[in-house]
Swiss-Prot record:
This is Ribosomal RNA small subunit methyltransferase I. Keywords: Cytoplasm, Methyltransferase, rRNA processing, S-adenosyl-L-methionine, Transferase. SUPFAM superfamilies: Tetrapyrrole methylase. It is found in: Cytoplasm. It comes from Synechocystis sp. (strain ATCC 27184 / PCC 6803 / Kazusa). Its main location: cytoplasm. Its EC number is 2.1.1.198. It is an enzyme of class 2 (transferase). GO terms for molecular function: rRNA (cytosine-2'-O-)-methyltransferase activity; uroporphyrin-III C-methyltransferase activity. HAMAP family: 16SrRNA_methyltr_I (MF_01877). Belongs to the methyltransferase superfamily. RsmI family.
Length: 279
């Protein structure tokens, strides 16, 4: 059996490439790369001549089985992404899971990860955090996630592209409130690296005046008790009445309101029963 190595590569500054990563890429039989042309430049810089094979979102299902067969035949393979740690908002999880099922050894070669670099530089709480990658561009799942993040007490980390940054900041302000603190990290480890700190409201103003360029990582403060909305029993009764008047059953209305308020569904269902008893 061969070994699968998960090799982290620099996210911008080539000086962040570790000696262990270079040695691993030099000695494996094959490098599975998200973009072979991009990785080829990295390999050339470090005088690494190991052959490559592509492994990306569009071919990973079929390629996973191909790589698995090579590993089972005794080849050692290194998996790399375009930048940072493979499997973090990049292909890799499926191959690692397949190796686990086949009892193939997986060894991580740690290194740069944008989300950790942004987090530790943010000045926000680092003891508990949640990473959500890129927000969905589809309206319903995007709104559902933002709704849940509004009450998330852990520090929140997101990635975003420059052309979507303002839309994401605006949506975050809608769901999390304009005074929520955040740090916007841009072009981490690169020449134009920047950290901007403020609130969602001031972030929107700043990036409206300063056109977003580069790759962004948003680190957002978790919710505090003051951020949590309070609901009176009468408010909840009114909401249930409204939902049931639209044709939802007691169960459906209770479930929907539970999702919106984060209150226990059983509590809301009991209120709906009381509404019926009250006539």
């Amino acid at each position: 059996m061969g070994i699968l190595y998960l090799v982290a590569t620099p996210i911008g500054n080539l000086g962040d490439m570790t000696p262990r990563a270079v040695e691993t890429l030099q000695t494996v039989d094959l490098i599975a790369a998200e973009d072979t042309r991009h990785t080829g430049k990295l390999l050339q810089h470090f005088q690494i001549t190991t052959p490559q094979i592509s492994y990306h979102d569009h071919n990973r299902h079929g390629r996973t089985q191909e790589l698995l067969a090579k590993l089972q035949a005794g080849q050692n393979i290194a998996l790399v992404s375009d930048a940072g740690t493979p499997g973090i908002s990049d292909p890799g999880q499926e191959l690692v899971a397949a190796c686990g099922e086949a009892n193939i050894e997986v060894i991580p070669i740690p290194g740069a990860t944008a989300l950790i670099a942004a987090l530790i530089s943010s000045g926000l709480a680092t003891d508990r955090f949640v990473f959500e990658g890129f927000l969905s561009t589809k309206n319903r799942p995007r709104q559902q996630l933002l709704q849940s993040l509004a009450q998330e007490e852990r520090t929140i980390i997101l990635y975003e592209a420059p052309h979507r940054l303002l839309a994401t900041l605006t949506d975050l302000q809608t769901f999390l409130g304009q005074e929520r603190s955040l740090t916007v990290a841009r072009e981490l480890t690169k020449y134009h690296e920047q950290f901007w700190r403020g609130t969602l409201q001031t972030a929107i103003a700043y990036f409206t005046e300063n056109t977003p360029k580069g790759e962004f990582c948003l680190v957002i403060a978790g919710a505090t008790p003051e951020d949590r909305p309070s609901f009176s029993e009468e408010n909840l009764r009114d909401e249930l009445r409204s939902l049931m008047a639209k044709g939802l059953t007691r169960s459906q209305a209770s479930r929907q309101l539970a999702e919106e308020t984060k209150l226990p569904r059983r509590q809301l269902y009991q209120l709906s029963l009381e509404l019926e008893a009250d006539g």
